[in-house]
């Protein structure tokens, strides 16, 4: 975005002020044709920027996996580096980024007010003046990430330590695999957002419709370009990384999942930081996992499935063979995915699954602590 701002400021034939005025006139034009032309011009500018996310381990790093050898990390570039995973970022005209900010100012902040137990990508509470309801024009749209991250982590650990004095405790850490690429943002999903906001917004309904439609069009256009670059065959309307509305929409996509955990399970602590989850729960005395936890023989999958897959202990659930919020995929990896009923009205191609390498369960007894960590 900084590059696009600098580019706009250094354009010789038109000033950035003139570009902003032209955008504003198109957006509020009573003639929708003018707005549609401007929108299409911005959409045509969308492209992908590719950056390495993960580098393959070097031969030396693999050799030291047994812990007997060390690795020297230096600033000297390697002769040959192999990229293991690529991260895709959206790129487009600065006007598109500005409209993304406008969506947050008009729609996103309304959605954000309804989120509970959610710590990442949170919009600043001071975005609008509490009394005048006017924008404060703060230079930052979102809360500082490090403050919310510390709060998310520390609250879980503090509660676990307090509970451990009298009860056995389980802590789960979960992470969704390539979350932004896993959702399928449907037209129905975006329309539902618009309907909810229209009922409590002072903004012109036509403007609300235009800005919401623009964000959806960006998602569709970017997803098409992403498939062309990545070779992805599955058709999904994914969340563009680097597009500001994606941060809010990422929370919106998991809102039903959050509610299901809180209402159905109601653990001692549930907190989500974008796609990372912390759960703290007291081990029920006399339960089938209590003795295993105390003996240090509790396996991850037993604890995880007891609480999140089999829903016999969930509030209002009578079918003991039914599932809670996750299902186990019939594959060799034994992947766990969120059940479709907790992702609707996202599209049918949505498949939000846990990342095996980052899933962990830790059991503590009030007499001693024992950690059980297992990859799926």
Give the residues covered by each predicted segment.
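Conserved polymerase palm-domain catalytic core
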Residues: 162-274, 278-291, 353, 361
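Extracellular/surface-associated beta-sandwich interaction domains
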Residues: 298, 352, 357-359, 367
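Conserved small/polar residues in nucleotide/adenosyl-binding loops
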Residues: 365-372
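Generic structural signal for hydrophobic residues
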Residues: 99, 253, 257, 293-294, ...
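Conserved two-metal-ion catalytic palm core of "right-hand" nucleic acid polymerases
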Residues: 1-207, 232-233
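Catalytic palm subdomain of template-directed nucleic-acid polymerases
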Residues: 181-189, 193-194, 278-328
């Amino acid at each position: 975005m900084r590059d696009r701002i600098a580019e706009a400021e250094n354009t010789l034939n038109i000033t950035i002020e003139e570009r902003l005025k032209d955008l504003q006139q198109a957006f509020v034009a009573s003639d929708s044709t003018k707005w549609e032309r401007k929108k299409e011009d911005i959409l045509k500018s969308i492209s992908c920027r590719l950056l390495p996310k993960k580098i393959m381990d070097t031969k030396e790093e693999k050799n030291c996996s047994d812990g007997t050898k060390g690795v020297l990390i230096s600033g000297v570039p390697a002769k040959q580096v192999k990229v293991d995973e690529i991260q895709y970022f959206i790129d487009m005209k600065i006007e598109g980024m500005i409209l993304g900010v406008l969506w947050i100012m008009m729609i996103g902040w309304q959605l954000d007010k309804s989120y509970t137990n959610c710590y990442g990508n949170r919009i600043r509470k001071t975005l609008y003046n509490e009394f005048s309801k006017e924008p404060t024009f703060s230079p930052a749209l979102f809360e500082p990430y490090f403050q919310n991250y510390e709060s998310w982590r520390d609250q879980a650990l503090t509660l676990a330590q307090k509970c451990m004095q009298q009860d056995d405790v389980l802590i789960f850490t979960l992470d969704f695999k390539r979350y932004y690429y896993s959702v399928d943002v449907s037209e129905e999903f975006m329309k539902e957002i618009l309907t909810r906001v229209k009922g409590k917004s002072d903004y012109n309904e036509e403007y609300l419709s235009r800005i919401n439609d623009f964000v959806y069009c960006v998602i569709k256009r970017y997803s098409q370009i992403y498939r062309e670059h990545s070779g992805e065959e599955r058709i999904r309307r994914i969340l563009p990384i680097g597009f500001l509305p994606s941060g809010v929409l990422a929370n919106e996509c998991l809102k039903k999942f959050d509610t299901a955990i809180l209402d159905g399970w109601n653990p001692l602590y549930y907190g989500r930081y974008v796609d990372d989850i912390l759960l703290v729960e007291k081990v029920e005395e006399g339960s089938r996992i209590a003795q295993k936890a105390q003996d240090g023989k509790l396996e991850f999958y037993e604890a995880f499935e007891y609480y999140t897959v089999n829903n016999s202990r969930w509030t209002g659930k009578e079918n003991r063979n039914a599932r809670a919020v996750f299902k186990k995929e019939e594959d060799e990896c034994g992947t766990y995915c969120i059940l479709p009923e907790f992702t609707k009205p996202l599209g049918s191609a949505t498949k939000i699954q846990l990342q095996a390498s980052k899933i962990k369960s830790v059991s503590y007894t009030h007499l001693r602590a024992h950690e059980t960590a297992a990859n799926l």
